[in-house]
Every structure is written in structure tokens, then in C-alpha cells.
Amino acid sequence: MKKVTAMLFSMAVGLNAVSMAAKAKASEEQETDVLLIGGGIMSATLGTYLRELEPEWSMTMVERLEGVAQESSNGWNNAGTGHSALMELNYTPQNADGSISIEKAVAINEAFQISRQFWAHQVERGVLRTPRSFINTVPHMSFVWGEDNVNFLRARYAALQQSSLFRGMRYSEDHAQIKEWAPLVMEGRDPQQKVAATRTEIGTDVNYGEITRQLIASLQKKSNFSLQLSSEVRALKRNDDNSWTVTVADLKNGTAQNIRAKFVFIGAGGAALKLLQESGIPEAKDYAGFPVGGQFLVSENPDVVNHHLAKVYGKASVGAPPMSVPHIDTRVLDGKRVVLFGPFATFSTKFLKNGSLWDLMSSTTTSNVMPMMHVGLDNFDLVKYLVSQVMLSEEDRFEALKEYYPQAKKEDWRLWQAGQRVQIIKRDADKGGVLRLGTEVVSDQQGTIAALLGASPGASTAAPIMLNLLEKVFGDRVSSPQWQATLKAIVPSYGRKLNGDVAATERELQYTSEVLGLKYDKPQAADSTPKPQLKPQLVQKEVADIAL
């Protein structure tokens, strides 16, 4: 009897040990179809697409901070602009013959229309709620002074009238008219100063953090979606079947687990480069990153806030990168209006606002150090600009503000440190390395891992960027009738251009404006503002662009 009891006891212990081992393994390794690294707007947007396209796929999102949308997607860490080239002068460069190129502006505007359609669709599905909580109508204006700049803006306005996307834009050189549009900018200004402005009523202010939170909250309603906060990726390893084993550390209790994923998206903002390098895919060797931060002056004084309802962008100074141009913006943050002015560039070796001072050094490798050196040597003007920005005093920043708000008072403003942006440096066969404006989707040949690098125009074009990723990584599925039908339901204009089609442009703007609660009046015929004869430009070295 004792032998039987002992044998049963041994079997029980053995079975219990097997059970415990199985549980330990389960806790150590989790399986998922899609792993989203980073709790920002890019991961949230991709997850939302995939939820409609493949509702049965399991998804896991990991975020190193204690909440989602706390880095670059956070409303206070970016300019909150719905970038559509209505006012951003860097998207319409002047050619050597003096003409204005609008190709980039058209592309940026087309991209933002996709974002508007994506958000409108999510509102109709109940994924996004209360549109005013994340998007509001704020007119977009360009404002310049000086004869050459006025001539440029007049020519830009005339050139943009060739596109159906920019109908409704108005132009004026009249002080009284511009004061009506933006009183804060004009009051106290020299009445003899030569000025010009354009204004488009359908501009927007967007809280990308709120969009991110709402998208992820909707994803969490499904049992096959898991969100893990305070979770940092420590390693990525490709398996023999082309899946990935990703080691994730719990920053609260120090434990680690492995997540086995069929597809991995690295949407970790500034940290994406280091994680892409960690993956070991050969495509990562072509890239390096350079971090640039931004500061804004902020006013919450009702006397200032209630006197300004516009986003007003100027023209970059000679020698400064185009995206460095100051702008004075109406924002809607935390449910109330504020006014921001900036940005002022800052420098830190961190790749994230909540990153490590070792980020830049640890991302430097034998394969990307030379491209970084070439970019530094070839963009000395940019280096000088960044140094000059870092050296700015409080008085310097206030004087810059007064160029756009002549009657500004120091006591109405405080300085705010916004997010970090990691600019793309890419290996180039001719130049060794080039600084790239924009974003790039980098993926392996097998389509099992992809990362988003870059900073501008960023969040405002999350929907088209993730659409591009789907086409690049899931090409066969995208071409299937099922995915085509779903994508066209999400983005009605998918697969065709709005530019040049007045009826289609007006139809989409009307639809998205109604759903998102935005102002939209059918544009009238453009005015007869004459196009000036611009002088040919001296051939100059192109100034590298950056995003702040």
C-alpha cells in the first residue's frame, strides 16, 4: 500500500511539475499574428486598418511608458497641424527660373485627404467619437513681409490655383483685410510695411494624442487584442519559419517574456531606428538618425487666445532649413484653446523625450558613421543654424515672437519643451549620405518586419503612410477583391487622385467635413490676383530640411 501511495504521489508531483512548466513556458512565450511596437498614432492606425481587413488576426501592442500617446503623438509634443500644404511655404519651392513648384504641395494635400477620410470612416463606425475632441476647424494662413517675399507668396497663390485641392484659398496685400483675418499679427505693425497673406478656411487643428487614445481604446474591446504598458523591447530574433521572437521586459517587476509574432511593426517614433538595427535585417544598414528637439512659447491668457483664431506660417530666413519657420497657432488642447509660437530648435542626444542620453551614440555603427559624417560636412549651414538656436536667450525668443505678434507681452508666455524628432540620414552612392525630409517605411524582403523612420509630415499623414506600408508588406492581400473592397470603404478615394477632379475633391471635402464637424463652404471662383514676373534665382546649394 505504501508503494502504491508513493507511486501515486510521484505521479502527482510529476504531473504538477509538467503543468507548472507548461504554464511557465506560456508566460514566457506568447504567440500573436501582429506585434505593434509603440503606442503612438502609427501603431494605432495600422492596428485599426488590420482590425477591419483581418478581424480574426490576433494583435499585441507593447509600449514602454505607462500610457499610450505620451511621446510624439501627445498633443503638447507636436504642432497639431493637419499638414495639407495650405500654408507651409516649404512645400512650394521656387525653381531656378523663378517659377513655383507645387508637386510636393499637391502630394501632401492628397495625403491629408486620405487621413480625413480614414478618420471620418472611424467616426461612422463608432471607433472615434466626438470629433471636436480631436479635430477642429482653424483657418490656415501664410504671412510674409518684404517685397521679395510678397512676390513669392503672390506667385505661390497663383500657382496653387492650378490644383482643385487649393480652391477656396484667398490672397491679400491689404493691411485691413489681413487684420480682419489675424488681428493679433497685424496690430502694432508698421502700416508702411509691405505684407501679404493667404487664408484657407478649411484648415484644421488636430489632437493626434486623442485620436491615438480613442483608436487603441476601440482595439482593446476585442478579445484578440492585447495592450502591454511599461513594456520595453530588449531583443528581436528571426526564427527559421520567418516569424520573430521578441523579448519584452516588464519595467515594473523586472521580468521578461518572449512574444512570437508572424509580423512585427516598429512604430516607436525616435526609438524605431535602434530597434530596426536590433533586428539585424540588412536594409537597416543604410540608415542613421540625428535627433532635433523643439520648444514653443505658450500663452493661455484669454486676452491673447480669444484674439487669434488661425495657424499663421511665415517664410524661413535665408540659410535656415525650411521647416524651421516660426508659426503662431491656435491649438485646442485638454479641451481648451491656447496659442503656441515656435518652434525653436533644441539639441539632445536622446531619440525620445523620455529616452536615454546614449541613444545617438548607441545607434552609431560602422555602416552608418560615414553617412553621418558626410551629412555633417555637407550641411554646415544647418549645423550653424542648430548651434544658433541652442544659444538663443529668453530675450531672443521673445523678439522672434514680436515679429509675428508686435504687441506681445512677456508675462503672457511660458516656454514649453516639445518632443524629439529623429531626422533620417540615408546612405547615398554619390554623396555618401543625405539628410532626408519625410518618412520612410523600411521592411525586409520577406515582408515580416517593417519600421517607420522619419518625422515630417508625420502624424497628419498616418493613414496614407500605413496604407503604403500595407501595400509594401501585404501586397498580395492588398490586391485581393476582399481587401480592395474594404480599403475603398475606409478611404473612398483609394486608388485615384483627387487633384484635377473638382467634383471629386468637393465631394470628399463635403463628406469628411460633415462627418468630422468641420467648416466647409463650396469654393467660389478664384480672384484675379495677377501673377508677378519672378526673377530667376541664383543657383544656390539646396538647404537641407528638417522637422521640428
UniProtKB/Swiss-Prot annotation:
MF terms in GO: 2-hydroxyglutarate dehydrogenase activity; L-malate dehydrogenase (quinone) activity
Cofactor(s) the record lists: FAD
GO biological process: tricarboxylic acid cycle
Keywords: FAD, Flavoprotein, Oxidoreductase, Tricarboxylic acid cycle
SUPFAM superfamilies the record matches: FAD/NAD(P)-binding domain
Enzyme Commission number(s) of this protein: 1.1.5.4
Keyword Transport: no
Alphabetical list of Gene3D superfamilies matching this protein: D-Amino Acid Oxidase, subunit A, domain 2, FAD/NAD(P)-binding domain
Pathway membership: Carbohydrate metabolism; tricarboxylic acid cycle; oxaloacetate from (S)-malate (quinone route): step 1/1
Reactions this protein catalyses: (S)-malate + a quinone = a quinol + oxaloacetate
Family: Belongs to the MQO family.
PANTHER family, alphabetized: L-2-HYDROXYGLUTARATE DEHYDROGENASE, MITOCHONDRIAL
Protein name: Probable malate:quinone oxidoreductase
Annotated source species: Escherichia coli O6:K15:H31 (strain 536 / UPEC)
